[in-house]
Amino acid sequence: MESILNNSVITFVAYVGIISIYLFVIPLILFYWMNNRWNVMGKLERLGVYGLVFLFFPGLILFSPFLNLRLRGNNEG
């Protein structure tokens, strides 16, 4: 019985780890990368980013209110 409980806990921890990486870690890294490189990306890099956005969309939608990809002004006026 203890072996089954131990396996269940290990499985649960593994699922939580994978889900947290999928929903939190990789989307935050992708947001940081997009925010820094958005206006200077090449064609292939942009295509790769679009593919990653499609792949990690559920995690990205959690953080979408915090992303601003608009052009930065030159602080005049």
UniProtKB/Swiss-Prot annotation:
One of its GO terms (molecular function) is oxidoreductase activity, acting on NAD(P)H, quinone or similar compound as acceptor. The keyword Zinc-finger does not apply. It catalyses: a plastoquinone + NADH + (n+1) H(+)(in) = a plastoquinol + NAD(+) + n H(+)(out); a plastoquinone + NADPH + (n+1) H(+)(in) = a plastoquinol + NADP(+) + n H(+)(out). It comes from the Bacteria. GO terms for cellular component: plasma membrane-derived thylakoid membrane. The keyword rRNA-binding does not apply. Its EC number is 7.1.1.-. It is found in: Cellular thylakoid membrane. The chain crosses the membrane at residues 12-32, 47-67. It is a multi-pass membrane protein. InterPro entries: NADH-quinone_OxRdatse_su_L. Keywords: Membrane, NAD, NADP, Plastoquinone, Quinone, Thylakoid, Translocase, Transmembrane, Transmembrane helix, Transport. Its main location: membrane. It is an enzyme of class 7 (translocase). Belongs to the complex I NdhL subunit family. NDH-1 can be composed of about 15 different subunits; different subcomplexes with different compositions have been identified which probably have different functions. NDH-1 shuttles electrons from an unknown electron donor, via FMN and iron-sulfur (Fe-S) centers, to quinones in the respiratory and/or the photosynthetic chain. The immediate electron acceptor for the enzyme in this species is believed to be plastoquinone. Couples the redox reaction to proton translocation, and thus conserves the redox energy in a proton gradient. Cyanobacterial NDH-1 also plays a role in inorganic carbon-concentration. HAMAP family: NDH1_NDH1L. This is NAD(P)H-quinone oxidoreductase subunit L. It comes from Prochlorococcus marinus (strain MIT 9515). The gene is ndhL.
